[in-house]
From Swiss-Prot:
It is a single-pass membrane protein. The chain crosses the membrane at residues 36-56. GO terms for molecular function: nucleotide binding. Pycsar (pyrimidine cyclase system for antiphage resistance) provides immunity against bacteriophage. The pyrimidine cyclase (PycC) synthesizes cyclic nucleotides in response to infection; these serve as specific second messenger signals. The signals activate the adjacent effector, leading to bacterial cell death and abortive phage infection. A clade D Pycsar system. One of its GO terms (cellular component) is plasma membrane. This is Pycsar effector protein MePycTM. InterPro entries: PycTM. Its main location: membrane. GO terms for biological process: defense response to virus. Keywords: Antiviral defense, Cell membrane, Membrane, Nucleotide-binding, Transmembrane, Transmembrane helix.
Length: 59
């Protein structure tokens, strides 16, 4: 509570602190998005390769 009171007393400091938090959150979200995108592509490739293996086995 004391930190919040200190930050709201100085508006410029509060805005800077808020901007830093938004920037940090956006970096985390971007990293998560990239990892999820890679995981989805790898899952698709695994499904296609397993389907191809089944087709090759049946021939």
């Amino acid at each position: 509570m004391d930190t919040f009171t200190a930050l709201t007393a100085d508006e410029e400091r509060f805005e800077r602190h808020l901007a830093e938090q938004v920037w940090a959150n956006s970096k985390v979200a971007r990293a998560k998005f990239r990892r999820v995108a890679v995981a989805i592509y790898l899952l698709g490739a695994a499904m296609l390769s397993s389907g191809a293996a089944v087709l090759a086995y049946r021939l």
